[in-house]
Amino acid sequence: MERIFEALHEVFEIAEDAEITVEANPGTVTPEKLSAYRKLGINRISFGLQSADNGELKLLGRIHTYEQFLESYEMVRKAGFTNINIDLISAIPKQTVRSWEETLKRIIRLKPEHISAYSLIIEEGTSFAKLYGEGSPLERDLPSEEEERLMYEKTEEILDQNGYHRYEISNYAKEGMECRHNLGYWERKNYLGLGLGASSLLDNRRYSNTENLREYTECAGQPEKIRKKHRASDGGRADGRI
């Protein structure tokens, strides 16, 4: 990571107050890693928690427990980070409206600056779709449409009551702690994606790098050769997917 940051500073002028986020899996952070992140200028940590219920985490195939997340969260705070996001997912198999409310309340008590609350989307062709997709044997374990609707309403209600305002489809923040990265998508600002399969939006046109590793490495330094897809944008707001 240090080499990546060195390369970025060589090519780009990075603002002193830039928002620099690292995604972290609960249970994988260490004081040493966090110290190194701070030295590199990283100032925001985003945890992929998904749920505060260990049973739901197991159904999602997550390797961490809620207790491990709490340890990691405390570690990040002790390291001096003052901007933390927590990702959550509703409509998980066997999840109830009450268990979703409990997850929200547990997270609120931790007082993170930002919460991303997504509804589960089952992608076709995935192993998860084979288990829970339409017509699958475990489809019945998914919350009903009415339960999903209630979860959505409870999300906004509970978070709003606790000082988190909704500023984008699935994102809630304390005042002034909105994620600049998310706002960039929403406001259709230019962004540059670096790496295999990365996407960019430049002058209202989308680009996607090749997903072929050999092609990518052989054409390093020649962006016109690794950008395999491009199309004019419709000019509407982005939904956060690329």
Regions found by a protein language model. Give the residues of each.
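C-terminal scaffold of the Radical SAM
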Residues: 1-242
